[in-house]
Regions:
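Short, surface-exposed loop or secondary-structure junction motifs
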Residues: 91-97, 150-356, 360-364, 379
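Short, small/polar residue-rich loop motifs at catalytic or cofactor-binding pockets
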Residues: 72-75, 356-359, 445
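Short, well-ordered beta-strand elements
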Residues: 361-364, 368-377, 517-519
Length: 533
């Protein structure tokens, strides 16, 4: 069976694997290496950074080539920035597996959740202008905003939108987007989600708050949408002329990469999805290349000014976006659109992104004004994050960690666990017929749905989007729910691979009648009750 990853992990910014446990393993490994190494290499002087970059190039290129071959990455581009200079930039491989067109430093890739740092910077710009304040209450800016807990609703502030500590489950209600519900429905759905931890205490990666954050920034700036703010406040001043944020712009480019996903048998091309990640807006909709992203990195390294001296954002509010808000582990923290990872020779501030077929990583060492960008046309195995951290560790003189092996091993283990969970028992209990249970249902987050029969096959159809989840017998009254690859969902289903999205089970009321269909997501375990109408 092909090696794939689950729905919610697709847009997480934490590893191309989009799995925080993978990163935790890497952080633990770095901690152990730091503690057991006799001593770190001498910290490089600022005047030697460019020389160190050039000296690293042969081993860097050897490392890239070996790892691309190891996990069958079709194409990749990397850039290393020192101050306002792109010191090293190169493309490797091809834009499409089996094709002849080579990747270069102008090839467009989706950057996924590396977009989130652009969002936090536009927030900082609005704060500079007094149009927003970091501690503004969200209900004062959007009276329709509501969480399950009334106290959390009142206390939720602007900085909370990006701090990944909402108290809700990881990737809360992201599944609504993959199943075609619009952004407003997703934002509204958070009022129905039960918290799993106390507000502001525990890291849990989410995307929907970033969609709302983009709307709030746009409203504060008087813009049509967040992308308009991105264009006028960051892309235009920096001259990022190749950077876009739509499916049409991506496919219109004569030099764009094609997405692939890893399988045990090698990478396979994935269908281009017109909606994802673009329908996730400020959470992950940017397309860019190495040359443009180098300009973005230079802005961060310069504390908010362009090479020409134009101030885009104040150093104070930009630094606030790099300030930790919640612990990821005992060795890493989440800020606003950035992860902050202490190392023996300085903090690395980074974020990555993963979409259907693409992975990206941006990493900064602010004290040394050093940055790395990695863009790839293969998702799910974590090469950009591993390569980015490996490169900075080498340049900073940190103890070495084999991130690529760690992330790949964890990825395979995660997949194996998923396969075991959904494998049908050898001697399953007979499943009751679903035809008598067909009818209309509703869920607060999804809205109306209908369980319909097509011959002997049952499918739950979401009225708001037309998405269909096929129910297949698993064990007794438990079924698996798999997205039917029809219409606009064909690309989504293909990208998700063969594993089901959820388990489905009918639950009886006090009179013993099956009145509720519960869907429990395979990834993360979030449950949705569809009640018979």
């Amino acid at each position: 069976m092909p090696f794939v990853f689950r729905t919610a992990r697709a847009l997480s910014g934490l590893g191309s694997l989009a799995c925080a446990t993978v990163l935790a393993a890497a952080f633990v490994a770095l901690s152990i290496a730091s503690q057991t190494a006799a001593a770190a290499e001498a910290t490089p002087s600022e005047t030697s950074i460019e020389q160190r970059i050039q000296a690293l190039v042969p081993s860097l290129e050897e490392y890239i080539s070996a790892n691309m071959k190891n996990v069958d990455v079709p194409g990749l581009a990397i850039g290393i920035v020192a101050g306002d200079k792109l010191v090293y930039a190169k493309g490797f491989g091809v834009r499409t597996k089996g094709g002849a067109a080579a990747v270069n430093t102008q090839t467009l890739f989706q950057i996924g959740s590396a977009t989130k740092a652009f969002l936090s910077t536009t927030m900082a710009i609005a704060v500079d202008r007094g149009k927003l304040h970091w501690d503004d209450r969200i209900v004062d800016l959007d009276p329709d905003f509501q969480m399950r807990d009334p106290w959390v609703t009142r206390e939720f502030r602007v900085f909370d939108l990006m701090a990944q500590r909402s108290g809700l489950p990881p990737y809360a209600n992201d599944i609504l987007g993959f199943l075609g519900l619009d952004r407003s429905a997703r934002i509204r759905s958070w009022r129905y989600v039960d918290p799993v931890s106390s507000f502001r205490t525990t890291f849990a990666y989410t995307n929907i708050t970033h969609i709302l954050a983009g709307r709030i920034v746009a409203r504060a700036e008087g813009a049509a949408d967040w992308n308009a703010v991105l264009q006028s406040e960051i892309l235009d001043p920096l001259g990022m002329t190749d950077t876009t944020y739509s499916a049409a712009a991506m496919t219109a480019s004569a030099n764009h990469a094609v997405g692939h996903r890893y399988t045990i048998d090698g990478s396979v091309e994935v269908p281009f999805d017109q909606l994802f990640p673009y329908d996730f807006d400020a959470a992950g909709d940017i397309n860019s290349n190495i040359e443009d992203m180098a300009k973005w990195v230079s802005l961060q390294l310069a504390g908010g000014t362009t090479p020409g001296g134009q101030r885009i954002v104040s150093a104070e509010n930009l630094a606030y976006t790099h300030t930790p808000k919640v612990a990821l582990s005992d060795k890493a923290f989440y800020a606003l659109g950035w992860v902050v990872q202490p190392t023996p020779n300085g903090d690395i501030v980074w974020h990555d992104g993963g979409t259907f077929g693409f992975a990206a990583m941006v990493a900064l060492q602010l004290d040394r004004k050093l940055g790395v960008i990695v863009l790839s046309n293969q998702s799910t195995v974590g090469m950009p994050i591993g390569l980015g951290l490996w490169t900075l560790d080498r340049l900073l003189g940190n103890p070495m960690v084999d991130y690529e092996s760690i992330t790949l091993a964890k990825a395979k283990a995660t997949y194996t666990d998923d396969v075991k969970r959904v494998a049908r028992p050898a001697d399953p209990q007979p499943s009751p017929p679903l035809a008598p249970l067909a009818g209309n249902f509703a869920n607060p987050s999804f809205g109306k749905a209908a369980l319909r029969m097509d011959g002997d096959t049952a499918a739950l159809e979401i009225a708001a989007s037309g998405a269909k989840l096929r129910l297949d017998p698993w064990n007794g009254a438990v079924y698996t729910a798999t997205l039917v690859p029809e219409g606009k969902f064909a690309a989504v289903a293909s990208n998700l691979g063969p594993l089901p999205i959820a388990f489905a089970q009918f639950q009886n009321d006090k009179d013993g009648k099956p009145t509720t269909l519960r869907l429990t997501l395979l990834d993360g375990g979030q449950a949705y009750d569809f009640r018979r109408e």
